[in-house]
């Protein structure tokens, strides 16, 4: 896709990928409602294919490509859930899926890529190394690059998540989503504002990876230098395409501490009895810190994924 998607294009994307993804449930918790003084609705993308919302964007990007575009397969660079999502999408399309991963990527995410038949190339844990390795694979195989977030087709697919939220809950006042590269937040903002112009959309990110916050404050996309956070899915800087939308349409960016992320993650596990990864806990962490006025409001929260290394949980002392 060459440009920013419309609501009708996001709806068409949902039709194309519907057979290959779950319409994930929306759960609530009376306990958390009482604690935060609001009606909270959790969109459980931790129950999605590959355990994360990334299945939506990767599947649409691969299935919407022409035969000529994917004749040599597809390639991406990712340390996280997009890697597994693209490997799975390539398998559905019947083409090779080349995945460049840093050698320090979480073990659980490496294993997920291999489970879906992805062809992994390891590299040093820098963006330059990842991009160079992906470019080499492109040159050698003719594979099409599917960027993890700075890709309009990926953004379009990610926007299908909030379609389901607002179809089921049209009277929401606010939606909270974590932000890393910005694909989910961008698709969410475009679709939500088109479906319900008065709704508020906030992006939440770790204070140790706060480029989105700084970018919105200055009006210029800021670099993500040396991110430090347990939310490994949010260590990437906001993409150019995402920022071109978000600086115009997003209601704000909230930063949260590592301690609040751990509290929110553990609270979700213990109270709701569901597994989420640190990145998925970041929106609830904003409520833990009381950084948003949600009193009496109906708030949608996107739980983005549930892929965790059970041997290295963030509340364990040796993490």
Each model region followed by its residue ranges:
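PLP-dependent amino-acid enzyme catalytic core
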Residues: 1-319
């Amino acid at each position: 896709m060459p440009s920013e998607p419309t609501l009708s294009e996001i709806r068409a994307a949902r039709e194309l990928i519907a057979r290959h993804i779950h319409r994930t449930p929306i759960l609530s918790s009376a306990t958390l409602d009482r604690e935060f003084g609001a009606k909270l609705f959790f969109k459980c993308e931790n129950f999605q294919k590959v355990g994360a919302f990334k299945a939506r964007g990767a599947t649409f990007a691969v299935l919407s490509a022409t035969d000529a575009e994917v004749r040599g397969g597809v390639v991406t660079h990712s340390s996280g859930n997009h890697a597994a999502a693209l490997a799975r999408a390539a398998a559905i399309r019947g083409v090779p899926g080349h995945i460049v991963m840093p050698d320090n990527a979480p073990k659980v995410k490496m294993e997920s890529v291999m489970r879906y038949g992805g062809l992994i190339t390891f590299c040093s844990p820098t963006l330059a190394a990842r991009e160079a390795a992906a470019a080499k694979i492109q040159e050698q195989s003719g594979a099409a690059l599917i960027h993890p977030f700075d890709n309009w087709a990926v953004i379009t697919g990610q926007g299908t998540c909030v379609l389901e939220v607002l179809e089921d809950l049209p009277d929401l006042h606010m939606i909270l989503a974590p932000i890393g590269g910005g694909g989910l937040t961008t698709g969410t903002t475009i679709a939500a504002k088109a479906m319900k112009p008065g709704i508020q959309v906030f992006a939440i990110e770790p204070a140790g990876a706060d480029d989105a916050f700084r970018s919105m404050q200055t009006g210029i996309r800021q670099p993500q230098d040396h991110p430090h956070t347990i939310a490994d899915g949010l260590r990437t800087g906001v993409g150019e395409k995402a920022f071109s939308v978000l600086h115009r349409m997003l209601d704000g960016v909230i930063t949260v501490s590592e301690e609040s992320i751990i509290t929110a993650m553990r609270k979700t596990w213990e109270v709701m009895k569901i597994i989420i990864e640190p990145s998925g806990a970041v929106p609830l962490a904003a409520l833990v810190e009381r950084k948003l006025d949600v009193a009496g409001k109906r708030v949608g929260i996107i739980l983005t994924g549930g892929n965790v290394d059970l041997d290295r949980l963030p509340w364990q002392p040796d993490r």
